[in-house]
């Protein structure tokens, strides 16, 4: 079976080789692990964001950036485009922010292929029937500071690899790379909701594609989190090709999949988060979804479309 860590390593090698051009910094720690700063103490770049997103997806997706993105005739922004022939593995088996990395006073949400070695969370890998067996572990962290050896040692132990084979990429939410990689979760937001909220077998999703605008960079981490989530919730468009079975209600799946189907829909995410006392667990899971969904049922040939791009809320969120 394909290895998300080995595929992602090909991208990481390119990033290390072109670090100066990408405006990123590569540090080798004393335990041999490698930390790649993509926005903490460096500027990062558009290309670095594109490659970082590819790493998050385990190297199993094509990532591109349109400038300007064709969000609508009257409102255009640079946008991230995702295409994958391995939707379940690339989005849920790699990209999903499913590992809460906490060591001492360091905390970050971990995404990327190393999760398929540590099996975090195990339920996700049981659902998609996947586990990696690579001898290299690659993790991306959404954090405002860089991890030390204690963090990479923990990652090595959890993934059962040597510390020298651990590669950690870091980008704050409030950085350009952070903004790009969160918009790059547009397809994953849909597969996540299919599995976690609608309890649909995501292995039936054979191909997927999506596009979402890149949120303006905001130095305030909380406001940046709001804007980046809104880029997908109000501006993300996705396409899923599903091999259904008799009894699957794909029309209902499509109708319930967009963010607008959520009870909490209607406000910028920052406002929703603030009203929830900054507690993610108080927010309806169904809100984390793309704005618009198109599903092609490969068994029947039917096509279903639901949701819409909400330009008004997007512009309100972005301050336009």
Swiss-Prot record:
The keyword Hydrolase belongs to this UniProt entry's keyword annotation: yes
Reaction catalysis annotation: 5,10-methenyl-5,6,7,8-tetrahydromethanopterin + H2O = N(5)-formyl-5,6,7,8-tetrahydromethanopterin + H(+)
Highest taxon in the source lineage: Archaea
Main location per the UniProt record: cytoplasm
Cellular component terms (Gene Ontology): cytoplasm
A GO MF term: methenyltetrahydromethanopterin cyclohydrolase activity
Gene Ontology terms describing biological process: methanogenesis, from carbon dioxide; one-carbon metabolic process
Keyword Cytoplasm among record annotations: yes
Pathway given in the UniProt record: One-carbon metabolism; methanogenesis from CO(2); 5,10-methenyl-5,6,7,8-tetrahydromethanopterin from CO(2): step 3/3
Enzyme kind, highest EC tier: hydrolase
Disulfide bonds: none
EC code: 3.5.4.27
Record keywords, A-Z: Cytoplasm, Hydrolase, Methanogenesis, One-carbon metabolism
Subcellular localization: Cytoplasm
UniProt record similarity statement: Belongs to the MCH family.
Annotated function: Catalyzes the reversible interconversion of 5-formyl-H(4)MPT to methenyl-H(4)MPT(+).
The protein's name: Methenyltetrahydromethanopterin cyclohydrolase
Native species: Methanothermobacter thermautotrophicus (strain ATCC 29096 / DSM 1053 / JCM 10044 / NBRC 100330 / Delta H) (Methanobacterium thermoautotrophicum)
């Amino acid at each position: 079976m394909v290895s998300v860590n080995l595929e992602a390593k090909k991208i990481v090698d390119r990033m290390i080789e072109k670090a100066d051009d990408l405006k990123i910094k590569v540090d080798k720690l004393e335990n041999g692990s490698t930390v790649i700063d993509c926005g903490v103490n460096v500027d990062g770049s558009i290309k670095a964001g594109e490659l970082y997103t590819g790493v998050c997806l385990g190297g199993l997706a094509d990532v591109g950036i349109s400038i300007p993105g064709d969000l609508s005739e009257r409102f255009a922004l640079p946008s991230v485009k995702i295409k994958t022939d391995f939707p379940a593995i690339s989005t849920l088996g790699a990209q999903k922010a499913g590992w809460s990395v906490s060591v001492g006073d360091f905390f970050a949400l971990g995404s990327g292929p190393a999760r398929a070695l540590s099996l975090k969370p195990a339920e996700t890998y049981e659902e998609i029937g996947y586990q990696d067996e690579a001898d290299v572990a690659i993790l991306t962290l959404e954090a405002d500071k860089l991890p030390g050896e204690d963090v990479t040692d923990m990652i090595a132990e959890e993934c059962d690899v040597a510390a020298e084979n651990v590669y950690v990429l870091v980008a704050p939410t409030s950085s350009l790379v952070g903004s790009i990689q969160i918009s790059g979760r547009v397809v994953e937001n849909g597969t996540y909701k299919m599995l976690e909220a609608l309890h649909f077998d995501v292995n039936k999703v054979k191909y997927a594609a999506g596009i979402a605008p890149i949120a303006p960079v905001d130095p305030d981490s909380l406001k940046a989190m709001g804007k980046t989530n809104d880029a997908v919730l109000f501006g993300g468009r996705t396409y899923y090709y599903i091999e259904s079975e008799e009894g699957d209600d794909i029309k209902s799946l499509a109708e319930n999949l967009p963010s607008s189907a959520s009870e909490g829909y209607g406000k910028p995410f920052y406002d929703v988060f603030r009203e929830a006392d900054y507690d993610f667990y108080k927010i309806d899971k169904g809100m984390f979804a793309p704005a618009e969904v198109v599903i092609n049922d490969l068994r029947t040939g039917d096509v279903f479309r639901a949701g819409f791009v909400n330009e008004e809320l997007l512009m309100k969120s972005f301050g336009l």
